[in-house]
Amino acid sequence: MEMEDNWWVTKLKALESKPQRLDALTAMNSAIAKEAALPRQIIERLLTTDQLYDCANPAADSHVPKDQAVDVTLELLCHCLDQLAMDTADEQLSSLLRRGLTHSNPALRAQVLASLFKKLLRQLTVGQVLTLPNNELIFLILDELKQPDTQSTSLAINILSIVLPQRISNADVQAKLVQLLKQNEIVRCRAYELAVVLAKKSATLLSDVTFILDAALSELDNDDVLLQASVMELLVPLAEQNHGLSYMERRRVLDIISYRVQRVEEHPLDALLVPSIMKFFGKISVYQPLKIIGGYPHMLACLFMQLQSEDESILPTAMDTLANLATTPQGKILLNMHFSGAMEKSFKKYGSHTKKLSAHIKKRLLNSLDVIYDFKTPPATEIINIGKNWYECFAGGAHANIIMDLINTPFPDLQMAALSFLKTICKYNWGIVALKNTGGAVEFLLSRQKDLHRDIKYMKWQIMEILSASAEFSPTETIRFTAYVNEGPYHVQADLDVATEPQGNA
């Protein structure tokens, strides 16, 4: 054991000499890769040796060729972390991870955070997250949120969402969180994201981070439109739980934000925020359709006005917003109840949009329709009838001519979006009838064109699979459909050369 320990000490000492560095790192990396589990004291020695971390420093000048030693060092430290019995209840853990978590190389910090997160996930899986002995580890991870060059914001927030609830009421932890709110807007937004993740967990945790959420709300008075849009995006998940929605109601968040739309004429700069506000209300309506559709009619009026526009800068967000409003059964019922005429008018406009707008906007339109019509559990009759009415407004009747026109375009992405929507409406009986009523549609689906993209062939095959199980077709047609399905999506028909005698002159 002593000889083995001396070998590692010698190799670590060699790191001080630049000419010997790469050979020493390579030797240690090879040695640790061969061992399933090195003795704990060797792993600890490696993780606490300054010279090893110095080898992981990236070049200050990006034009300088990459030092191979950096990659070998990262690999070696990754092996160390894998072999470390990482006990989050151990007082020593923060000192073992400190150099990695405070290193200037974001890739190294990401490795340490990933290893720690993996360990915490195991604890979560068995239902026993160990109690941290002090604040040190939390402080180190909170500092990652302040790093200007980070690859690991999400990792750090995921870790903190697991361990921070243990010590969120601690005065020193609260002071550390307050420090984040004094940083630049990027760091502040990371703090807001963390607060929302914690607040979603319980009403108690929401209470503990209310001061951060309140700071986020204060940003809505900022002159920076991009910052306001980012904050609105971060706040959306609060509405997923009733306690989060209650907080938003107490702070009148929805009222304040919707008022910005009403006062656009007085404050023209607020017009820049309207797409973000629409997105905000649309996403919240996925969780709280009654609150949004029933409570903010002027927001819906603004949305319907945008959908009648042909301005391609605002249409994508508007179409996504309508999809969010109409994605749930309750959303469909409420829209049909309160805005029946506006919905029919919007779907008719969608039909005309498919003839006028650019290909990528048409694709976005079809994707939004896919979201509205798709379902996981069979819908009630009322939902089926609402969807049928909206579709016929879009298509101009009980047929699929518009969709087939979009399939017959030279844009593969648009073809795929159109086929995907066709497949979705074929989940409804009225959709199958619409397809059946469309001249050439079934023949196109049954054709075996060789030049089609594989994804398109597969989508056609999926649609035929649905049609083969439908009672809308004759037994003869069903046999043809079933044969097509059994042949598979990529079946190639053999070319038959029929020999014929040349016709002689009479």
UniProtKB/Swiss-Prot annotation:
Acts as a chaperone during the assembly of the 26S proteasome. This is 26S proteasome non-ATPase regulatory subunit 5. GO terms for biological process: proteasome assembly. Changing V261T: Does not affect interaction with PI31. Coiled coil: none annotated. Pfam families: Proteasom_PSMB (PF10508). Interacts with PI31; this interaction is increased by PI31 ADP-ribosylation. Interacts with Rpt2. Belongs to the proteasome subunit S5B/HSM3 family. It comes from Drosophila melanogaster. InterPro entries: ARM-type_fold, PSMD5. It comes from the Eukaryota. Changing D172A: Does not affect interaction with PI31.
